[in-house]
Amino acid sequence: MGRKFDLSVEAMLENLREVRSFIKSSGQTLGVDQEVLSDLCLIVDEAVTNVILHGYEGKDGAVDVQVTRDEDALVIYIREQAKTFSSSDVDTPHLETSLAEREYGGMGVYLIKN
């Protein structure tokens, strides 16, 4: 079994910085490439943001993040007790629309899947 790192935070947007810092420091300790680590920080930030905004909807709750590495695989678990949703219910964003014209949000699930 590889090394394991755990973090638990309250489901508040102001805790996203701590989550990103945790992913970065855990990844660095585990020898993850900096470019890959930057992508992982963005993806985990998007996932936790979705949990906070759409899962807990402002209610109290916790988000637990675990980072493990076993052989060649890095695994990140995000655990919560929020309301569930199906990612298949989320529309694919209009990528041809410029960032200036695009509505705020709506990219999280796309980034996570891709």
Question: Predicted segments — roles?
Answer:
Residues 1-6, 52-114:
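Conserved beta-strand-loop-beta-strand hairpin that lines the nucleotide-binding pocket
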Residues 2-34:
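Helix-loop-beta hinge of the Bergerat
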Residues 23-45, 101-102:
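Conserved short strand/loop->alpha-helix "switch" segment adjacent to the catalytic nucleotide/phosphoryl-transfer site
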Residues 46-50:
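Conserved polar catalytic motif of the HATPase_c/GHKL fold
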